[in-house]
């Protein structure tokens, strides 16, 4: 989802449209046998190579992939981030703690109603959280009604997809990322296409908010101030009182 959005923003810049500068950082690793995850990482790295070498992108867009993302690497990333991308499809991901670490360090969150995002949004207030995407029940309804990804693709999405299909990020090789493209437009098990328009629109809200520095900083401080619920002290006390019955 995020990589596809970067491609769409790349196209906007190439077409001369206004763009609030971004440095987009990806981090992760793939299990040895997870072919699609490896292909996505290759795709991200290829996007970075094309974008970062394009003079039209200077001062506007940069893409970075951090390989073998780890706790140690996270110690440098969490304090440096302005925006936390918590974009799993609603109902598809177990709750983690990365979003809490970003929040405690002042990053604002763009995310779906999935995992601990729900608690973060409840704590900081909906006005201090960039919400996008379908809910878990809406995702279930899509599948019950025979979800077909192409029904959710607008002109912006098709332009990005066609650029990928044409080999722009694979040195002219039109087959390299065809498994990824075919998966998105014919299968899309994580409903990327269903969420893409909403995600792109909310990213515009992120950019506009960033330009209002006082508003952004106020939102950041409110996120930090309301992050205490996720502290280990609170969690341990809660366990002692409600489960273990000790002091």
Where are the language model's segments positioned?
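Long, K/E/R/D-enriched contiguous segments that form extended
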Residues: 1-75, 79, 89
